[in-house]
């Protein structure tokens, strides 16, 4: 394992007010308004920059922390390409997406990677005006709708009018159940790659196994071969040096069960997916067709993510926040949104004890944040996030 000396920083994070229940989302990918994130805390962070060149010897492990970081150069960084090349949809599809697929395969050892979406961000979050802030996010949702009907994977934010901004709200896009809904509902290319996973899980659900108990069958029991491995990742890269509002990642190893807040959310759905793969099975009535996912106009369906309450430990280190200081375009964050292999063995700790809960965890809570001492007059950070599904 690599040996590094952690450097501590502090930053401002926005959590749900403890005890508050988040409102249901009304648009795909739209988090609750900033007004619901009333618990604003200044918390310590560890700088991961010294780990970037350690490769597989990095102390930050996907299977433990839910994230890692790598130094990774893209062909789009060198001539004849320039900054605006990152807004060229053809170049992203022909050059960058294959680079991401290769990186994920190299880091995880998976056999297949399906790129499912890309998001470019280049706006400031207008915190002082909640209506304006919501509109900035809404522009992004409109862009999602527009792009989802065209080429796959959708690329959002490559037009100056899209107005996509960082999300200064502590969250994780998918719960384990949300991840399983995603591979069934989001797009036929993801679902096709996940067919063996879905069929294995559906056999268990039809036998009465509950959704939350699927984690116990990853390795299989008795004569069952178990559920094949799948994972969902976000590969996050700045497009210029980051001088404000960096992205932080919370460690799965220390984030307590009591601070995870399940939240109903909406996600685009593909109506062309075969019914036997897209259906949602009720283990208590497996022969009935369950369509209670809040299907609404615009081709969305209900899924589940996590928001969070702030830490209550005395030193306020329970959430184990990490980031890369002065992050450069070759400093890439690999964020695990879900991994069913990790979920099979990893449990969220119980707050204030050395014991583990029964909550299976498979992905890392994350958030944009205000770094203490950052230049508040600096230009908005610019980044590209590529989401992908991996299969073994």
UniProtKB/Swiss-Prot annotation:
Signal peptide: none
Disruption phenotype: Impairs the production of N-pyruvoylanthranilamide ans downstream compounds and accumulates 2-(2-aminopropanamido)benzoic acid and 2-(2-((4-amino-1-carboxy-4-oxobutyl)amino)propanamido)benzoic acid.
EC code: 1.-.-.-
Class of the enzyme per the UniProt entry, highest EC level: oxidoreductase
Pathway: Pigment biosynthesis
Keyword terms, alphabetized: Oxidoreductase
UniProt key word Transcription: no
Gene Ontology MF, one: oxidoreductase activity
Highest taxon, organism lineage: Eukaryota
Family of the protein in this entry: Belongs to the asaB hydroxylase/desaturase family.
Task of the protein: Oxidoreductase; part of the gene cluster that mediates the biosynthesis of the yellow pigment chrysogine. the NRPS chyA mediates the condensation of anthranilic acid and alanine into the intermediate 2-(2-aminopropanamido)benzoic acid. The remainder of the pathway is highly branched yielding at least 13 chrysogine-related compounds. The malonyl transferase chyE converts 2-(2-aminopropanamido)benzoic acid and 2-(2-aminopropanamido)benzamidine into 2-(2-(2-carboxyacetamido)propanamido)benzoic acid and 3-((1-((2-carbamoylphenyl)amino)-1-oxopropan-2-yl)amino)-3-oxopropanoic acid, respectively.
Cross-referenced NCBIfam families: CmcJ_NvfI_EfuI (NF041278)
Protein name: Oxidoreductase chyM
Source organism of the structure: Penicillium rubens (strain ATCC 28089 / DSM 1075 / NRRL 1951 / Wisconsin 54-1255)
